[in-house]
Amino acid sequence: MPPNTVNKAAEIPPFEPIAIVGIGIRGPGGINSLTTLWDTLVERKSHCFPLAKDPRFQRRFNPDDFKALFDGIPDSENVLHANLFDETPGLDRTYFSLSEREAAGMDVQQKLLLHVAHEALEDAGYSGAEDGSAFDPSTFGVYVATATDEVIQDPRDYDTDIYHLVRTERAFLSGQICFHFGLRGPSSSVDTVCSGSITAINDACRALATGDCRAAIAGGVHVVTPVSGPISFYCIKRAGFLDRTGQCKPFLQNGTGYSRSEGCGLVVMKRLSDAIREGDRIHGVIRGLCIRSMASPKFISQPNGAFQSVALAQAVKISGVDPAAISFVEAHGPGTAKGDLAEVSSLCSVLAQHRAVDNPLTVGSLKGNVGHAEAASGTHSLAKVIAMFQRRRIPPQADFHPSRLNPTLQPFFDKHPIRIIENEEDWNASHRIAVVGNFGASGNAGFMVIEEGSTFQPLEGRDVPKVSSPLPFVISAKDQATLVKLIHLYIDWLKQPSTFLTPLSDISYAMTARRFIHPFMISVQADSHMDLVQKLQERPPMINGSANRTPREVAFCFSGQGGERVDPRDSTLYNFSASFTDAVDMCFRVAESENLVAEEDVAILELFALEFGLVEMWKSWGIKPVALAGHSFGEYVALVCAGVLTVRDALKLLGIRAALIRAMCLDVPGKMAAVRLPLSDVNKCLEQQKSTRVELACVNSDNSVTVAGTPEDLESFRQELLKWYPAASWHLLNNMTAAFHSRFVQPILADFTNACNEVKVHPSEMVVLSGLLGKMCPVGDAVLQQHDYLVRHCRETNRFGTAISDYQRQNVERETPQPDWLEIGSHSRIISFITPASDQLKLPSHGKSAGEGWMTALDALMRLYSAGHVVDFKDVHYDVNPSAHHTDLPLYPFQLEPHFYPARREVKASSTMLASTNEVQFCPRVPSTELAPLLLNHVMAGYTLCPATTHVALMMAAASTFASSSQQEGRLAYKLSKLKVIAGFTNTTDGWLQVRRQSSTSDLEIISNDDNKIHITARAEVCKEQDLLESLSLYASFILPFKSFKFLPSTDVLRKELAYSLFNHTVNYGPHGQVLDRVWIAEDGYQAWGYSTYPGGASTAEGVPSALRDFSPMLIESVCQLIGFLMNTSTNRKDGEAFVTDELGDCSIAISKLYETKYVEIYASYKMVDGGTAGLGNVFAFDDKGQLISAFRDVRMAKMKIYVLKRLIDRGRKPEQVVTTQHVASTEVEEDNVAHNDIDDKVISVLKAALRLSEIPLDKTLGELGLDSLTAIDVGVQLERLVPHRRDHLTIDPEGNLTSLLQLLRPTPLPKSLPITSSTKESKVETVDLATSPSLPIMPNGVPTTVNGVPKPNALPTVNGLHKPNGAPAANGVPTANGVPTADGTSTEPSQTLVANISPEMLQAISSNPEVIQYAPGRTPLLLIHDGGGTSFAYYSLGNLDRTVIGIHCPGLQEGKGIESVHHAANEYANIARQYLKQQCPGHSKVLIGGWSLGGTISMMMAALFPDLVAGVVTIDTTPPGVVGLTAQQAESVLLHPWSRTDGIHGLVRRQLQLNTRASFAHPEYKTIIRVTAVNVPVYVLCAIDPFRPSESLDLPKETYQWLLSFKQSDVAEVTWKELIGERLLGVQSVPGNHWTMFTPANVKATTEALKQGLDVIEARLNKMG
């Protein structure tokens, strides 16, 4: 070996200093932050408790599991101590977008890691932005340590499923963090037992040093779980590690082992250089780290002091730190005699040798406070040191006194300057440097040298913003309720005195640039801490959008001359924005260095520099334009931004042009004037007044122009103009240097041409809207490179407005969203010329004065951000506030749900199930006559309906009856679980209710006289009252803090009278039903407190059946009614809707306590679920002693229309419609349909089992039902075995519903049938004819009253589907009614008789606008517009279209008013469609539209007028314009001919027919608009194939009869529509029936198929177009 290579490997490479920039911590005793950890340390708290005697142990573990293992082991009771969490670690599954099944399948340690990782990332200021910084998610690593599993990896002992692998494989610990936070760097899960944390951190440091990642999150987790806990305790005890008396006792003489603990700790790290550069707050800096195996040669787990010394010396050497500079050691300190001895000896040998007496080494260990958290212990120790750095204090060692020191350690303390302190003291050191030790039982151990971070982040002497102006602030959350809570957290935090010490600029930086962005947000601007508090208290508008919404785009328009003059060097932006300042300085430097602009023309330089500076500022903030439009002078700056001209050349040309104007045009008497009048009108006047020689100088917009001429000519023109158009606006522009864009600049053109020829012009790099050409010029357009372009631009008319219109038109044609507009200049005059789309922004970027610069720009920035533009707030702050650093902010308020994955074996806890029996048991029947007083106190939707609390009382009484004699001893309490409402029970004279118990179970059902119909089901349990009260007490600590909002001024306080007046729209409560005396509703509307003295009153027994004398239903009502009140008085309920109890979830009541208390205080809270269609909440009640005595958890209330609820009660059906294996098909059952039903049954069975559902609702997507990625794989494997013919196609879409999945899996195309819903429990296969079967609800007129199982309003007549009494098909109209227009043209005002006989349900139905007819999210929604009769009821009979279908009634239907015109209706319905998309379909920006007859006409008009909204059109037998030559009176004759009824709804419909017919004929612009605009969306036409044969001759034109009687309508329609819209017509399809019979039962199937085919053809074309 060559000499120069010897021992090179022994050299220690330099250690890259690693900054800890974020931390998240969890520990026993409620430790959830550095603050709570510090409180534990300085107050000498111990969180150890004996397992056997603590209720927390009883809640989590099965005592019998411990008893079986430890029976006979000495000191087992003392050994079984631990430092456990107060509550099971929970999960906010909604925040992490997890299904219930997926959340249930996760290891509890994974759940804990997700939340602690979120807090560590928030603490570090990680926002998830892919910005190329060290925090870019693509280079972010994850390193996690653990030592235990929640479930032992033997699947025989557990209920294994698709998630078993996820639960048991430790790799998923780090993988879950990567997945949920989108981190794509290295990922690793390690296990070195107790030293896991420091090992994980070491791995992360090495990866950072080598460049494998640029940021990392690392640490450990440990939770003692019900499954693994007993056996792990037993094994550790047998190994001799557990202390015989309880808590860890580091360094003490009575220490015999350690006490187990739980915890989690994660730190976020970067290279120190990156952290300093990126403005991070640095908690500490890791200077050196060494991991070694230190096992004794004799025994793997026996510590070895000599080996530890080697590792510690190596860590110190790597750090480059003088050992004497290390002043504190956070020792591993397990409290074992050998372990403490080995560790202290190593510390003395490395750190205490040659140490001065006045520089003692302080040693401590937090295990005396929190125990040993095993794999998480290292991060616990690290967190303690960081807390010490922040406070510059050293906490006392728990339970320490010099007299208690372990005698074996005394020689080391006598010989070396080393100490343990018993009182808190200052940490006095010039540089605070510490060592953290962390050892593992496997022999793996490590030491870390860490230095305080303040050394690298000095707070003193920092720069502050140069001007005292407002700064931006943003708060966001995943949902509205959480956002409100977070706002209050910020308000409380900002009021704290310590927060006032934090610079406002740091707070702004942290809130905008260093936080996750969520869908619900607010943004404000404030210039002080208290101003920010005030702005937040004022409840700024909430933005509801998607965090992943499609980014919006912006276009810049540049101001011309003539506005307010602003010197950019005087602007507040010049002192605030570095990018603005640099750009402005560059312009002045270039101009002045070459004398490009004369002093007399400095205003031009100022305007140019201002606009160029604004552009550079916006670009530096991440706002980059997609198009540039300059108005006159402004086009020079636009060309510079587009790369056509350089700054120098643009200034040179502007300087030359200005000099030429001064030299040649000052004596030319040209002036300019602005005219507010349509361009066409101005052109007419110019044509008439040619003699005045007034010229059109600028086309600003369609309604604004600028003209030029001599003063005399302009005055003459003005006078003549105002004669013609008195309303025209005229404004003389006196501040212009010349009359540009007119003959008055002709003298300068020759010289200016020479100047332009000398300038080098480059291809454009951006879209430019040319004012010269009046059109959009794409990137690289050669016309902009012509040297005479700017010469012509100076002389010819500037067509700015025409260019804008051309750009907007091309965006429509390309189906490109219109951008927002930002004016670059000192005013907002130019953007006023732009006509925006409905939601387009038009914003100025600078005020009219220099002092308004920053305020205007900031306001525009925040409005752009709120609208969805991508703003790089890091760059914003770097530009305006480069000294800003990240700082502490309130953490996100998660809504946690506890859960441990259960073992399959039964838990042998104290039995609460009912006595065993092998027979079905019944309680005595309770007749409805006894229930009547209860029902009369509960009237819903006009019906006396049995309240759910009566069912609860019946079941509790039954549980008491069925309980065994041993269970009935002492004071009892009752639990009901899985409590579901199946159907309501209404008062009948001979009715009854009865509780039935299934054999060998605790399952109870309430049945009634209605053929033993089941009304409600639940599982019942009986338990000791004291046991129940102890378990309920756990919730009290979480609930009581919310009591504070009762005293806030923003809380609504309602007394009984007002409360029940608000509640009456849903439920009318009788005197005994009004159990709430007072209600406090929180500001967020999602939580409330109630107060009730009903339990203490004498009325609790009044009207109660004898069977329920010990279980008063109204007494139970007093503790749960609040949840229904809260939901039904919230903003989530609209008029005509109600929240109705669907499931009561789990109910626990100490009934005796409820009878004894004088009053109850009730707390209720809820959240919206299932896409806003239901509320899910909890309600708890406290007695007069403050004890929690009842709980209703997971109460689900479905939201529905009142009229639907009424019909459901009528039919005795459950509110939620669920699917069974029942199908609507042809009465002639074919073999393929039998095959379909067989496959359907199997598919539904697989889904039910996989999703753990008893039924599959049709109105929810599979994703909403819990079909996540892993479940989809599981289901897919099973389905491939069932349907091998579809293996190559099988992709299960979570966005689809059951119908779409069945269609995918059937072996042949979907048959001509539709799935309907049923509430029956039996699974039958039936085939039902759509038209004739009585199983499908049919109206008297033959139109189904349900579609896809969704009930439609009773007696829903459709004009085109009604039948006359003799069975002949009705015409599209109704006969004359009193007060209704007649066929002869006479008319009167609508009479009250028109609505007198219409049912409330029908009035409710026609007032619901728009109406959801079918619901199937995913594909583009279909909007169907009413026919000539004004209703959309015809569309209810359509079959399944596999998409959401929305119907629009005529808004004036109920008032007897028709449409004003086709044009007006198109505008009105477009607004309805936009609002529906925004509120209900945020993922869609367009709709497919269509309609029958008049509905098709309006649809075509909408397509012509609103191509940004309409994706395609399907017309249903709509007559092409100009084909049928009828007068309005003749049209009425045809439409009204077959009708003979005049009552009720028919009168309204008849009036609609007549009014709408006249409106259509009175406004013949329809054909012209269709032809001129050339409808630019795909169109598909359906035509009736049969002719119309009236029963008598009508006086009609010949061509009309030919159309009505011909079989060739489709041919004529195709030719006519083709002539009008050309290639956009994709097809014309004939449909059986004539115009008036297309939706009758005989023809509706064919109409459905044709409509569906047309929609598919349109979507295929749209997909092809991209």
From Swiss-Prot:
SUPFAM superfamilies membership: ACP-like, alpha/beta-Hydrolases, FabD/lysophospholipase-like, Probable ACP-binding domain of malonyl-CoA ACP transacylase, Thiolase-like
InterPro entries with a match to the protein in the record: AB_hydrolase_1, AB_hydrolase_fold, Ac_transferase_dom_sf, ACP-like_sf, Acyl_transferase_dom, Acyl_Trfase/lysoPLipase, Ketoacyl_synth_C, Ketoacyl_synth_N
Pfam families listed in its UniProt record: Abhydrolase_1, Acyl_transf_1, ketoacyl-synt, Ketoacyl-synt_C
Chain positions found as O-(pantetheine 4'-phosphoryl)serine: S1269
Top EC class, one word: transferase
Region named Proline-rich linker region: 1334-1397
Region named N-terminal hotdog fold: 905-1034
Gene3D superfamilies per record: 3.30.70.3290, 3.40.47.10, alpha/beta hydrolase, Malonyl-Coenzyme A Acyl Carrier Protein, domain 2, Polyketide synthase dehydratase
Active site: C194 (for beta-ketoacyl synthase activity), H332 (for beta-ketoacyl synthase activity), H372 (for beta-ketoacyl synthase activity), S632 (for acyl/malonyl transferase activity)
Name of the protein in question: Atrochrysone carboxylic acid synthase PKS4
Organism: Calonarius odorifer
